[in-house]
């Protein structure tokens, strides 16, 4: 039954990719809340997007479809960065004046190793696929399949506690290495937010819906809470080594809605930046 469901989603995904220059009809896409199944290999899909990009709405829909297709194994971060993510204060106001960029996303976008030269573009575990670190949406699914076939090297767990009085979240992330690794390993913990509504270009000239005025942005990167590429948690870790890190993040100065936010944590090779495992949990537990 699960295979039948995946085939149906793949057919839908293929249609979305083939129609990537056309408008996305309402409701644009639906989103299921998924959290990590820590008994399986997990994959990070980064969707580099922008509200001035006419192809980014279909790409966002494709990213969400892939997260549903590989429920509990694929986790999406929507990174608003690059020239198509800038506010437009001339041509499209007031629909596209919002600025969804953040320092973390800007630095990732500018990393020459990632070679993100356009929107939409994505990375799957920041590992090469067909000789490229970043690639267009039509390649995401096959890159995910390849990434999921890699051996699992770690088990991760995350426990979040939200204090409603002072609007802070405390998180503890435990990483158990299942095999010995060479080199340094970093842990990066990011805040992402769902259900932000705003304008999104969605067409070529003459399309009946050139701007989706209430597009639902999901998985939006708000920033990292422990540095652009995280911090070191292990150096040449042996099998069964456990690394534990705890953080507190303050929402009180932010306009973000904690109930719409999740923390997403991933470990990576400190040198190559390849993501080795990822986990996600809501800021406020249901």
Task: Give, region by region, the residue ranges found by the protein language model.
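Bacterial Sec-dependent N-terminal signal peptides
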Residues: 1-5, 13-44, 286
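Secretory pathway export signals and precursors
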Residues: 17, 49-52, 98
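The N-terminal extracellular segments of secreted preproproteins, especially immediately downstream
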Residues: 20, 52-55, 187-189
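Disulfide-rich extracellular modules and peptides
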Residues: 23, 55-58, 124
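Intrinsically disordered, low-complexity boundary segments flanking structured domains
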Residues: 30-32, 62-67, 141-147
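Local sequence-structure signature of Cys/Sec-based thiol-disulfide redox active-site neighborhoods
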Residues: 34-84
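Short, conserved sequence motifs used for protein processing/export or organelle targeting and
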Residues: 78-286
């Amino acid at each position: 039954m699960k295979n039948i469901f995946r085939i149906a989603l793949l057919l839908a995904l293929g249609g979305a990719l083939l129609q990537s220059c056309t408008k996305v009809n309402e409701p644009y896409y639906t989103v299921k809340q998924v959290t990590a199944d820590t008994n399986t290999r997990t994959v990070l899909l980064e969707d580099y997007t922008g509200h001035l990009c006419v192809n980014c709405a279909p790409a966002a829909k494709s990213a969400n479809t892939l997260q549903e297709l590989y429920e509990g194994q694929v986790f999406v971060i929507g990174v608003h960065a690059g020239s198509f993510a800038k506010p437009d204060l001339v041509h499209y106001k007031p629909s596209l004046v919002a600025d969804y960029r953040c320092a973390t996303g800007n630095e990732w976008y500018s990393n020459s190793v990632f070679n993100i030269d356009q929107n939409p573009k994505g990375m799957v575990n920041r590992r090469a696929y067909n000789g490229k670190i970043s690639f267009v949406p039509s390649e995401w699914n096959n890159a995910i399949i390849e990434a999921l076939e890699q051996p699992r090297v770690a088990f991760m767990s995350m426990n979040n506690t939200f204090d409603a009085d002072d609007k802070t979240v405390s998180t503890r992330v435990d990483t158990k290495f299942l095999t010995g690794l060479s080199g340094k390993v970093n842990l990066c913990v990011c805040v992402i937010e769902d259900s932000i509504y705003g304008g999104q270009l969605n067409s070529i000239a003459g399309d009946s819906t050139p701007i989706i005025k209430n597009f639902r942005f999901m998985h939006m990167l708000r920033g990292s809470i422990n540095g652009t590429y995280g911090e070191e948690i292990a150096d040449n870790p042996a099998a069964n080594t456990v690394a534990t890190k705890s953080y507190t993040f303050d929402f009180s100065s932010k306009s973000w809605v904690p109930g719409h936010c999740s923390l997403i944590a991933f470990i990576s090779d400190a040198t190559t930046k390849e993501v080795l495992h990822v986990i996600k949990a809501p800021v406020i537990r249901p």
